[in-house]
């Protein structure tokens, strides 16, 4: 398997080099940056009617991870198979949840996961809000506390998640994650170190807590489980290393990196569930681990898929390449609520050896520039511009780059110049089509953002 993967075009791997953490940490936010002038109340920045655009609304309910023969479904089943057949035991039989609704509360998505009130992830520049109280989940961890309260001991949650982001071959405002959690009852920790939950302890910084035998045991089980899982998907000879990290809802926290195509790539975030979360879920004497992994990322690496937009295409030239890879008998593997799961269905492993995407689109890209002055620089955010471009031009935009940024001291104004690359995945775009798209974008730009065209 590893030998086959080594033949993958290095350009696929290089696309990930230097990407921002909002994508690399596919399930766990990393930023702890606070506004230097004090804490930001992001609820005051949320538009009264939300900030969810039509193009995002149209993606809700597509559930690509549940569509048989879709590469995301194949990756999901590969991981589920390993947890069901290799990592389940009498006490921990992993349950699968694939159909939780993406509309969740701010409490579920942020508060219960200990996100600080001024965490950048709460910003409407990063998150899609229906209102100040409800949003489109930014990670499948939004369902963690609910399932813990319902006494689920071992589970995987897969779903679509939503984040406002840049435009390029590996970023898309909708992508898919898998969250995994395993709970260890009190006999694993209290009997060992006799340390119940203590609200006075800073569990992020307290080294005595991190050195408890129960915490070390859970950490060991976490790393062993995830190493066996990733090797079952990518290859048994895979090199893996662990990097210390920070996430609001785990402590200690880690990132897994794999050595692939000559460089180390971060593939998932994980850690021991924060004791405060366990306490709030009525499990103060228990410990648990959790991880989050992005399905698109694995699929792009494994199947040599060069552009994240392809996962959303309806072109049969894409889908026919994965048809029949899953040879298992078709059974429903999704649950619409936490009261049911797919654990009763026995999964079969899927052989993905030699499955490589063959590009059918060789159409060249064409770029157009747009320059403007920022009329309200303090409230301008690049994600607002990217969102506007997506809404105006759809998936015909391959990527957008900021190519010039300067301040005119006499005018006391800042100018941005963005280069917009147009490219269809399934046909050749004419110059006339591109000119119309660019003209319409310029026509609407000043009315939608506080800018002045140059």
Swiss-Prot record:
InterPro entries xref list: aa-tRNA-synth_II, aa-tRNA-synth_II/BPL/LPL, Fdx_antiC-bd, Fdx_antiC-bd_sf, Phenylalanyl-tRNA_Synthase
Swiss-Prot/TrEMBL keywords: Aminoacyl-tRNA synthetase, ATP-binding, Ligase, Mitochondrion, Nucleotide-binding, Protein biosynthesis, Transit peptide
Pfam families from the UniProt entry: FDX-ACB (PF03147), tRNA-synt_2d (PF01409)
Region (Disordered): 327-347
Enzyme nomenclature, EC number: 6.1.1.20
Top-level taxonomic group: Eukaryota
Tagged with keyword Aminoacyl-tRNA synthetase: yes
Ranges of biased composition (kind: Low complexity): 328-347
Subunit structure: Monomer.
Function: Is responsible for the charging of tRNA(Phe) with phenylalanine in mitochondrial translation.
Name this polypeptide is given: Phenylalanine--tRNA ligase, mitochondrial
Organism of derivation: Dictyostelium discoideum
């Amino acid at each position: 398997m590893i030998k086959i993967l080594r033949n993958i075009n290095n350009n696929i791997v290089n696309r990930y080099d230097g990407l921002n953490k909002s994508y690399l940490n596919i399930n766990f936010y990393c930023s702890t940056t606070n506004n230097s002038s004090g804490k930001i109340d992001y609820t005051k920045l949320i538009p009264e009617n939300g900030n969810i655009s039509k193009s995002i609304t149209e993606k809700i309910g597509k559930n690509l991870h549940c569509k048989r023969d879709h590469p995301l479904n194949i990756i999901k089943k590969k991981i589920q198979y390993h947890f069901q057949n290799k990592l389940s035991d009498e006490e921990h039989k992993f349950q699968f949840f694939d159909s939780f609704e993406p509309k969740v509360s701010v409490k579920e998505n942020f508060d219960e996961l200990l996100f600080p009130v001024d965490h950048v992830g709460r910003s409407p520049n990063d998150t899609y809000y229906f209102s100040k109280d409800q949003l489109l989940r930014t990670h499948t961890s939004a369902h963690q506390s609910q399932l813990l309260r319902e006494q689920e001991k071992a589970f995987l949650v897969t779903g679509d998640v939503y984040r406002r982001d840049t435009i390029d071959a590996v970023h898309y405002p909708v992508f898919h994650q898998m969250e995994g959690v395993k709970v260890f009852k009190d006999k694993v920790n209290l009997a060992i170190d006799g340390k119940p939950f203590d609200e006075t302890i800073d569990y992020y910084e307290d080294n005595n807590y991190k050195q408890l035998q129960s915490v070390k045991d859970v950490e060991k089980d976490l790393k062993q489980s995830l190493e066996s899982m990733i090797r079952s998907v990518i290859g048994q000879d895979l090199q893996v290393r662990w990097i210390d990290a920070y996430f609001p809802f785990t402590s200690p926290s880690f990132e897994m990196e794999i050595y692939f195509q000559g460089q180390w790539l971060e593939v998932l975030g994980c850690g021991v569930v924060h004791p405060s979360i366990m306490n709030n879920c009525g499990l103060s004497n228990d410990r648990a681990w959790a991880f989050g992994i992005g399905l698109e990322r694995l699929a792009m690496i494994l199947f040599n898929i060069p552009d994240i937009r392809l996962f959303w295409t309806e072109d049969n030239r894409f889908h026919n390449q994965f048809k029949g890879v899953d040879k298992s008998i078709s059974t429903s593997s999704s649950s619409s609520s936490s009261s049911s799961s797919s654990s009763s269905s026995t999964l079969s492993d899927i052989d993905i050896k030699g499955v490589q995407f063959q590009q059918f689109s060789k159409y060249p890209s064409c770029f157009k520039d747009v320059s403007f002055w920022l009329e309200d620089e303090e409230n301008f955010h690049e994600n607002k511009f990217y969102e506007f471009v997506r809404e105006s031009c759809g998936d015909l935009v391959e990527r957008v780059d900021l190519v010039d940024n300067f301040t005119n001291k006499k005018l006391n104004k800042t100018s941005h110049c963005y280069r917009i690359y147009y490219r269809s995945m399934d046909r050749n775009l004419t110059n006339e089509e591109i000119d119309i798209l660019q003209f319409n974008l310029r026509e609407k730009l000043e009315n939608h953002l506080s800018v002045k065209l140059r």
